[in-house]
Curated annotation (Swiss-Prot):
The lineage of its organism: Eukaryota, Fungi, Dikarya, Ascomycota, Pezizomycotina. Belongs to the flavin-dependent halogenase family. Disulfide bonds: none annotated. Its EC number is 1.14.14.-. This is Flavin-dependent halogenase radH. Radicicol is an important pharmacophore as an inhibitor of heat shock protein 90 (Hsp90), an ATP-dependent chaperone involved in the post-translational maturation and stabilization of over one hundred proteins, and which activity has been implicated in diverse pathologies ranging from oncology to neurodegenerative and infectious diseases. Keywords: FAD, Flavoprotein, Monooxygenase, Oxidoreductase.
């Protein structure tokens, strides 16, 4: 099948975000073309999911396919931030016997999503990369600012295929799901900004024969995340259904290179991995009988966001817009929730539920709120890891840690905003997010993210004056805005928070055949 000359919606990128957006739109009868630069199945890191993924899959009739595929069930997860003890999030206790999520082999799960887009009615093409976009001026009452931009209206994309073909496709709407390449943000808007406190580097590999965590208990073989004892970062073990365990380490890039230098000229990533494991004694013990069955891979793991996630007739989703440290497995949730927001807002614009500006703004705000929520909880955990003995979250004793960990649980478990409102006092939230002031500024109305006023020059680079994660503080009013964020956008395992959340006077209408926005 040849790539058509035109379509209603072009989705650039066939990862989880792009495939989900294509499915959601095609199921509404929209003429969708999905272009993926690579060919499935293809390798990707990011194997652990939150329970909030289930209702998102259910909405496009893909939950049962995931259930039957045989992925490793994720009943919960353990997090050991300090040397004292671990906290555990129990998905099944929170949501019932079917409240679990999965650990996935990404080559398999991403292919399921991509194929489902075709089953839903999208025209899908692999090995086809979007190289450039063509814009036309768009001055129709569409001001830049907030989380939207107006570089003009994208009307066509130039593409090239691995088999040597090339061409142009015109469209009415664009969904940019081009992953970290982020063609719209990096090439045209030039608005990607890195979080100076989360400039990390990851190394990882796959093992066989590891001991399961919590063997002989109901928590046996669940994912385990452990902070390094020197505060440099954290390590993970994620069991997979193919008999391997994904094991990796995420640490500050400056400390990674310091470790590398200290080990001498002939250092390998395997040697650095071994040094990291020494600082995570529980994981080190689990790996004692295990055998490494892959190379040790390496990638930058910088967290970033953007000043805009939408504009005239385009939406940015998934890693194309923002990426956050994967400590709490937020990637799939943010990708699919953002993709659904794109589909909702595009249908709203198409059907006249609201203006294109209002639809774009709703999408951009939805993406930004999700990113900010996970930024808060990730920074809370990572600050505790880096400070180790200092009680960032609460008193570091057994009871105190359990109380502090309740701050994180509703977000990780997908318990929704009601649980957060019930559980926390101003003091508890203050202890957890006092370092996140600049991330909160945007939600409080200042319109800026942490790195935009804390060391970023607006070009994706950072200067040397940025505060470290350990030193950021916040005033009381910003703490209160943090409570509002948590109360408003915490993910839910039944999508009730997405359906019941109004942004600028609009609520999503999640009905098949009637997808869009309702004015409230």
């Amino acid at each position: 099948m040849s790539i058509p000359k035109s379509c209603e919606v072009l989705v650039a990128g066939g990862g989880p975000a792009g495939s989900y957006a294509a499915s959601a739109l095609a199921r509404e009868g929209v003429d969708v073309v999905l272009l993926e630069a690579d060919k499935h199945p293809r390798y990707h890191i990011g194997e652990s999911m939150l329970p909030s993924i289930r209702p998102l899959l259910r909405f496009i009739d893909l939950e049962e396919t995931f259930e039957k595929h045989g992925f490793q069930k994720k009943l919960g997860a353990a997090f050991k931030l300090t040397a004292k003890r671990e906290g555990y999030t129990d998905f099944v206790a929170a949501h019932g016997p079917n409240g679990y999520s999965w650990n996935v082999v990404r080559s398999e799960s991403d292919e399921l999503l991509f194929k489902h887009a075709a089953k839903s009615g999208a025209l899908t093409f692999q090995g086809v990369k979007v190289d450039s976009l063509e814009f036309e001026p768009y001055d129709s009452d569409f001001p830049s600012g907030g989380k939207v931009a107006n570089p003009g209206r994208p009307v066509a994309a130039r593409w090239s295929a691995k088999d040597g073909r090339s061409g142009t496709i015109s469209f009415q709407y664009l969904v940019d799901a081009t992953g970290r390449a982020g063609i719209t943000s990096t090439k045209y808007l030039k608005n990607r900004k890195f979080n100076e406190g989360l400039k990390n580097l990851a190394i990882w590999g796959y093992y066989k024969g590891a001991r399961p965590w919590a063997e002989g208990t109901p928590r046996e073989n669940q994912p385990y995340f452990e902070g390094m004892r020197d505060g440099a970062g954290w390590c993970w073990t994620i069991p997979l259904h193919n008999g391997t365990v994904s094991v990796g380490a995420v640490l500050r890039s400056d400390l990674f290179f310091a470790k590398k230098k200290s080990l001498g000229e002939d250092v390998t990533n395997a040697m650095i991995m071994a040094e990291c494991m020494k600082l995570c004694p529980t994981i080190k013990e689990l790996l004692e009988p295990a055998e490494l069955v892959s190379d040790i891979k390496q990638a930058t793991d910088y967290s970033y966001s953007a000043s805009a996630y939408a504009g005239p007739y385009f939406r940015i989703v998934g890693d194309a817009g923002c990426f956050i440290d994967p400590f709490f497995s937020s990637g799939h949730h943010l990708a699919m929730a953002g993709a659904l927001a794109a589909a909702v807002s595009i249908r709203a614009s198409m059907k006249g539920d609201c203006s294109e500006y209002e639809a774009s703004n709703w999408h951009a705000r939805k993406v930004d709120e999700g990113y900010t929520l996970f930024l808060l909880v990730v920074m809370a955990a990572l600050k505790q890891i880096r400070m180790q003995e200092e009680p960032v979250l609460s008193d570091i004793d057994d009871d105190g840690f359990d109380r502090a960990f309740q701050f994180l649980k509703p977000v990780i478990q997908g318990s929704g905003s009601a649980e957060i409102v019930k559980r926390f006092t101003k003091k508890e939230v203050s202890e957890a997010i006092d370092f996140a002031v600049l991330a909160l500024d945007n939600m409080a109305g200042a319109g800026e993210h942490a790195n935009e006023t804390n060391g970023s020059n607006g070009t994706g680079e950072t200067n040397g004056d940025a505060k470290t994660l350990e030193n950021i503080t916040v005033e009381d009013e910003k703490v209160l805005s943090g409570i509002r964020i948590l109360a408003k956008v915490a993910p839910s395992a039944d999508m009730k928070d997405l359906e019941g959340t109004a942004i600028d006077g609009f609520m999503p209408r999640l009905e098949h055949g009637h997808l869009g926005l309702n004015r409230v």
